[in-house]
From Swiss-Prot:
Organism: Rhodopseudomonas palustris (strain HaA2)
Subunit structure: Homopentamer.
Superkingdom of source: Bacteria
Function: Channel that opens in response to stretch forces in the membrane lipid bilayer. May participate in the regulation of osmotic pressure changes within the cell.
Subcellular compartments: Cell inner membrane
Any one GO MF annotation of this record: mechanosensitive monoatomic ion channel activity
Similarity section: Belongs to the MscL family.
Protein name: Large-conductance mechanosensitive channel
Matches recorded under SUPFAM superfamilies: Gated mechanosensitive channel
Transmembrane segments: 19-39, 81-101
Amino acid sequence: MFKEFREFAMKGNVVDLAVGVIIGAAFGGIVSSLVADVIMPIIGAITGGLDFSNYFTPLSKAVTANTLVEAKKQGAVLAWGSFLTLTLNFLIVAFVLFLVVRAMNRLKRKDEAAPAPPAKPTPEQELLAEIRDILKSGSRPQA
């Protein structure tokens, strides 16, 4: 049973999938940092220093806090600023993955589009070509 599991786990597709998941998780952290530390501060500066992560709408009259963390402690809130940040994060990840897949597809197309060198004719094909040429010229072969 262990041997079967080892053979299954070492197949190319399973190993490739595992590597992809690990790289994807690391890539997700990079993109999250890009959104939180680079893009959202720029958007905040453009909009006058607004921090979208603290945008919320109270769903209860008991919520009187000015920050999302405090408001969640007081009652139900609709944290649409966090949702906006996560949506932007998703769109950036999807766009970057689109660019990667697009580049990979272009590389594959270039490899597929490269014409293969013509195959060398076999001895039979060479003999047939000689016979064809003799018949076209109308002359008799010399023995």
